Amino acid sequence: MKQYLLILFSIFSFPYVWGDAIGTWKVYPSYSDASDIVPTGKNVFVLASKSLYSYNVNDGSLRTYSNNDVLNGCNIQNIAWVNAVKKLVITYSDYTIDLLSLNGDVENISALADKQTTDDKNINSIYVDGQYAYLATGFGIVKVNAKDATIADSYNLGYKVNYCYISGNSLYAASESKGLMKCQLTANLLNKNEWTSAGDYKKQNKEKYVYDSTNKCYWATDSDSKLTKYQKEGDTYQAVSTGVKPDGPEYNEHNYIVYDNGRILSVRGRFDYVSFDTSTPGFVQEYAIDSDTWYCYDNSYSMDKGKNCIAQTQISVDPKDKNHIMVAAKSGLYEYKDRKMIAYYDMNTDDPILSVINKVNYSVISGTRYDASGNLWMFNMGNDNILCLTSAGEWKSFNQRNLSKDDSYRLKSLFFDSRGLLWFVNDSWKAPLFGFYDIKSDAMRVVSSFTNTDGTVILEKKNIFAITEDRAKNIWVGSETGCFYITPDDVNAMLSVDGENTNVRPTQHKVPRNDGTNLADYLLSNVFICDIKIDRANRKWFATSNGVYLISSDNNTQLAHFTMDNSPLPDNDVRSIAIDDNTGMVYFATLNGLCSYQSDVTKTYGDLTDDNVYAYPNPVTPDFTGDITVTGLTEGAQVKILATSGQLVSEGTSTGGSYRWNGCDMKGKKVASGVYMVNVATAEGESGIVTKISVVR
């Protein structure tokens, strides 16, 4: 094999090209808030922000663990080391249990999660005795045999157990509601009557510094949440190592994300219209994709002025300066430059922003968007004016009779379409509507009558959350009961009528059943849709309360439905989607974490050139099992892959700017080792280019 590979490369010159294989996932967990540190001798395991990593004491290396590699879940609640069998017990918020060995093998116990019961199955803490792990749960105690990965016993006590332990010959259950209860180990632990009171409940406090008996030291996290080694000198602890932790976001909460200039920008959201909740401060995070590095934006400007930054909901990037962004929030408008806040605007600053009616303590900027000239447009809840902060720094107001000071108008999800119209939705069930503002004519058009082309009322007192334009210039709208779109002709009709347009009939797409009945079903009917994004192939990505749906360009085929059950999604409630059109990477934001999926659609090019067209991975090594991707193609490019003998092994049309080959010939058989020629021509067949793929079996 090695000799063949050497001969192959001596004949043909192949740059080693690798990209993320189509269908692969990445997760981006936070490690900022350590809750458990577990020394095991060679390794120190750390549970931080519901994610797991380990530090190798001998070589100083870090390893992360996730549901994208070895683990069977995410949102970890507890960890504990069972030294007798050298396994780490991991419990999750969905009540599943993993047993992780030092070699990376994982055994899963799903019996508790699978148990059909109305009891509270939440696992509050773990106590280890010998080869057994005792789980304190919402209904009692579960005894796990870590040696053979089974549940040995389950003691339903009928009340929440905060923690448990063994002392002497008794098992103790500490409960906030029942106090401290105990039962002799030789008694019938299944019998609730055998459990007797042993005193009052005392809260269990975790030690900040965890002693490592093997390495004769203490472990804790420093002020930057980094794992640090300490030695105790008298009553004080002295750091004797530099702190370490994996890179990641500060928080796992991602309510809104946007792709811009090779980075993902994220805000936490948590917008509560009812109360002015300050428990979730605003926070901007940036992921630099090429360097795989996370940055946290500096909010000290507002903090120094005693101004709370609350519930940031939308990010707008200045088209003239990518390092200048504006963020809409429940507490006003925030301006950042070079990852630092430099200004904020609200009802108390010199601008036309108003406070929410009857709530004078805060002002809501519900949505923002820059136009191509660098002017920032925004809606201010409780204000019947559209506001604009020009590129010169001048504030302007445009009164609109379709707006109201009523707090039922929460206009958001702003974007400019291909015509230059500023679209928005109102996510209040009191007044569901969508529409646009024409900045050239200072005219607003809205649709609040939602009767579809069949004459059926499709929205009545329902929330609308998402709006976007597809590549056929249809405007798609997502609500808590599904999706619909209006056509370019509908938009023209809206432009021809002043004010509210009741003649527009949104289209609910019908998907044929193809079962001989001539019946059809509405696309994603009764699905709660939070966001919609369109990729280069005009496919629709829907973020919903039940995962992510990918729908074909003709809207008739569900190409994928990702959930926590079949993907590394950290939560089924997906709030936002961002697409890197250059690479085809699709990012999914949830309040429990961020992840990405490598799709098969990339940027399309105007011409076929040697610089743009290439295949990856190249060479295709024996251990590779995915699809090979040819990228850098024009829209609708015709692709033929041939062996050196001239035999055709694959042909087809590009999807977006890429073409997928499964490495098989026309009969579905894996091709042999060799060099394969990729002939590419435009959709019109007017020009072509050849690249090569090396396959090594």
Language model segments and positions:
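Positively charged n-region of N-terminal signal peptides that target proteins for export
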Residues: M1-Y4, R697
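Carboxylate-rich, polar loop motifs that coordinate divalent cations or form catalytic acidic clusters
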Residues: Q3, W18-V613, L648
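Sec-dependent N-terminal signal peptides
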Residues: Y4-S13
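Short, conserved beta-strand segments of beta-strand-rich sandwich/propeller modules, principally
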Residues: M585, A672-M677
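Glycine-centered coil/turn sites that cap beta-strands in beta-rich domains
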Residues: D607-K640, S658-W661
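Short, glycine-anchored, charge-dense loop/turn motifs used at functional sites
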Residues: Q638-V649, G668, Y676
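Glycine-centered tight-turn motifs at strand-turn-strand junctions
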Residues: L648-V671, T682-E686
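C-terminal tail/sorting-segment detector
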Residues: M677-R697
